Amino acid sequence: AASDVYKRQYPDCSSKVLDQVNLSIQEGTLNVICGRSGCGKSTLLRHLKSVLMPHGTASGEILYKGKRLREIDHRTQSQEIGFVMQNPDNQIVTDKVWHELSFGLESLGYDNATIRLRVAEMASYFGIHQWFYKGVEELSGGQKQLLNLAAIMAMHPSLLILDEPTSQLDPIAASDFLETVKKINRDIGTTVIITEHRLQDIVPYADKAFVMDKGNVFLEGSPREIGAALREQKHGMFLSMPVPMQIYGATDSRDTCPLTVSEGRQWLERYCSCLLYTSPSPRDRSVS
């Protein structure tokens, strides 16, 4: 997926909600889009699926597998581009778990044998078989969002887009859900584009990160490159990065920036050892 200097302006609005957006997503990668609330993250994601695109005037092109997105029919987009929304209840359309898993495939006209096979695969992969016959009203928020994800993956999409999918979930359910997203990318090779406010659970595992501000993508690169750039610019988004990166940024260390807690612990041990080694002894201080 790629966009070529894309702009979007809402009706009766003088300012652009997206401005000079130019980015490229490599197939099979996990990509995180981050930025302050209202910077245009959700709007950008909705432009990656035509039926969700907001009204207004736009210029530029969005390409999917080398083709203009607006020229790709809705059926192909429905099957190949999966989209998980913020609120789990806004996406569920049936009353039973098993029916929700099969609904997308039924709508696309798959035969019963294929539907049964894919539903069984997804129920097993996501651990849904334990509540397969339950009504959706009996599910927790985390289970509902997992069901949405499984129903989308049953259609075997090439691109999975997630718009702050854990915003309605408790911390444990959110962590479990993001682990599943990482597993999908790692095991199946599905390209993932996600916006998420719990950056510590997803940024360290991303292949590429993008930072938005006022409708523009002003930084892109690996998580370490993004962290270093935000630190150098003293940008407010640095305080939303994973805690190990924040601690590293508060020091004068030139070592490799840690991303995970494990890396942070190892870096902190090296940093503290270096401080102890270079600090003057009490006798040296008294002489001075």
Region spans (language model):
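Conserved ABC ATPase "signature" region
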Residues: 113-131
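Conserved ABC transporter NBD signature motif
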Residues: 57-68, 77
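H-loop/switch region of ABC-family ATPase nucleotide-binding domains
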Residues: 196-197
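Conserved beta-strand-loop-alpha-helix hinge in the C-terminal portion
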Residues: 212, 216-255
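Catalytic Walker B motif of ABC-type/P-loop ATPase nucleotide-binding domains
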Residues: 160-163
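Conserved ABC ATPase signature
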Residues: 135-139
